Amino acid sequence: MVKYMVLKIKDNIYCMSFIEWKIKEYRGLDIEKGTTYNSYLILDKNNVIIDTTRIKYFDELLSYLKDVANLKLDYIISNHISPDHNECIEKLIELTEAKIVTTKIRKYYLDAQFNTKDWEFVIVKNGDELNIGNRTLKFITDDKCEYMLTYCVEDKILFSNDLFSQHVVYKEKIDSDIGHKIMLDAKEYFANILLPYRKSILKILNILKDLDLEYICPSHGVIWHIMIDEILTKYRMWCSDSYKNTAVIVYATIYSSTEKIAKALGEGLSEEGVDVIYHRLDTSPLNIIMRDILDAKYVLVGSPTINMNVHPKVGMLLTYIEGLKPSNKKIGVAFGSYGWKECATKKIIEAFKRLGFKIVDDKILTFRFAPKENDIKKIKEFGRKLAKINV
């Protein structure tokens, strides 16, 4: 299989996209479509590489730099300190003696990863610029955000690191060749990786609105060109905790009892015009569930009681959601079934309280063994009433 692709973005500006075809997991996420690690090369009086890649691709990276730049490298810009963007830095410095351009806080983390005693650093702050010959690079950063962004003023290109990324491999590298399906990939990435940093990202978005942008070049996935305004608008929405009239119903079930409650709730909600998305935990990966929860108004979680607790997959879900700290502008509903003693919904409600959700509770949503026909009618009615409640 092809290990990397090269795309010429503009004269003397290239994307080296290193392809991880068979990756199944990234930071605990299920990765179904692979991912890429994008490194960017600018050839000028001073040659610059913006972020590197995983060490297993070093030979390919080195070969390309020899071919197009004769291994002349003056600056390595480190927008992010995680290994998928930095593992090749040490070897590149040994071969080129390039200077590292980064922020004070990111230097601290590079010092923790490498022996940097002999490295030459250029420490930059938000708004600082670096002239590399015919081009000026401007740096955008917020120390509460994991990522620094680099803007090429003359070419109107934003190198955004993880912002605007997607975990996906397409044979095409530009959004114009793919279409709007890329938006779902970008939403999934935001919901599962960037969501805890949304307040800092919103500050960065306020800076970006004053920039003239022709390309946004992220560290993973596809480059943005014709859909820049749309992805910026989406990011602003996701960062501002706005929501749609959507209900995400997530559940685990053993003997279909909890599933019957889930379906009845969904029918009641949909009858009142709410868009309903079902996720059964034995078939839906957490990252897709979180993508849908991101801008949903209602989050309904169901579990049978097992060993005086929630189903293990529900426990994993709740822990995962809490770690990502979604908006508290949501209505939370717990439901479930039990045999001896009901415990699951209490655990779910405790998690909702920690998340700050508005909780709507009703005894009609818990059943010993399974709901009967008359119970199903009551559950649907609860769903219809739920659709009229405001956050």
From Swiss-Prot:
InterPro entries: Flavodoxin/NO_synth, Flavoprotein-like_sf, Metallo-B-lactamas, ODP_dom, RibonucZ/Hydroxyglut_hydro, Rubredoxin-O_OxRdtase. One of its GO terms (molecular function) is metal ion binding. It comes from the Archaea. Signal peptide: none annotated. Gene3D superfamilies: 3.40.50.360, Ribonuclease Z/Hydroxyacylglutathione hydrolase-like. Residues 247-387 form the Flavodoxin-like domain. PANTHER family: ANAEROBIC NITRIC OXIDE REDUCTASE FLAVORUBREDOXIN. This is Uncharacterized protein MJ0534. The lineage of its organism: Archaea, Methanobacteriati, Methanobacteriota, Methanomada group, Methanococci.
